[in-house]
Every structure is written in C-alpha cells, then in structure tokens.
Amino acid sequence: MGKRTPRELRLRRHNRIRKRVFGTPERPRLNVFRSHVHIYAQVIDDTVGHTLVAASTNEKGWSGSPELTKTQEAALVGKLIAERALQAGITKVVFDRGGYKYHGRVKALAEAAREAGLNF
C-alpha cells in the first residue's frame, strides 16, 4: 500500500469527526468545504439529508473583490451564511470543520459566523 494523499487523510479525519457530529432539525450542522480557490459553507439537517442554507465564494454575483485575500473572502462567506441561517430561523448549529485544521480560512469563516449571530 502506498503513501496516502493529503485528500485521503482529510477524508479519514472527516469520517472520524462525522461519527460524533450530527445535525438535527433543532441544531443543524454547519459544514465547511475548502478548495484551493473557493470556500463553501452549508447548513445541513442530517435527519433528512437536506441542505437548509448555503453560501460560497463560487456563487453567481459574488461581491468579492480582487484585492481581498482568501481568508477575508472566507470571513465574508461566514457572515453571509449566518445571515441566511438567521433569516431561515436557525440560531444554533453544530460546526463541522470537514477534516480541516481549525486555522486560517476555516477559522475565519467560523469566527465571522459567530460574530454575525450563529451559536456554536
């Protein structure tokens, strides 16, 4: 068996985390996916497997400017997902970092969502 790729290692971590992190209708899961260029956030009800709200830097009409860093854009996505969740009546979530370290863009998104009113 060869050396595992960073993607395989992240997926193993994510599966390990998902054994404990589960979204309910009262407290859905805030999931984060980070690609090299974009960052995506979804609020998911795992009991039925539905995405309740979503936000990303890959959306049509994204208002990010070329002067912003990826970390600053992640903070804007965090604020946007929190605003959309609050409009949908969601105040409490369970944070799922997706196997990524709680650092950099993932941390910026989470802190911006907390500041905008989401509790986790």
From Swiss-Prot:
Single GO MF annotation: 5S rRNA binding
InterPro entries (UniProt xref): Ribosomal_uL18_bac-type (IPR004389), Ribosomal_uL18_bac/euk (IPR005484)
Keyword Nucleus: no
CDD domains: Ribosomal_L18_L5e
GO annotation, biological process: translation
Family annotation (SUPFAM superfamilies): Translational machinery components
Entry keyword set: Ribonucleoprotein, Ribosomal protein, RNA-binding, rRNA-binding
GO cellular component, one term: cytosolic large ribosomal subunit
Family statement drawn from the similarity comment of this UniProt entry: Belongs to the universal ribosomal protein uL18 family.
PANTHER family per record: 39S RIBOSOMAL PROTEIN L18, MITOCHONDRIAL, LARGE RIBOSOMAL SUBUNIT PROTEIN UL18M
Job of this protein: This is one of the proteins that bind and probably mediate the attachment of the 5S RNA into the large ribosomal subunit, where it forms part of the central protuberance.
Subunit structure: Part of the 50S ribosomal subunit; part of the 5S rRNA/L5/L18/L25 subcomplex. Contacts the 5S and 23S rRNAs.
Protein name: Large ribosomal subunit protein uL18
Organism encoding this protein: Chloroflexus aurantiacus (strain ATCC 29366 / DSM 635 / J-10-fl)
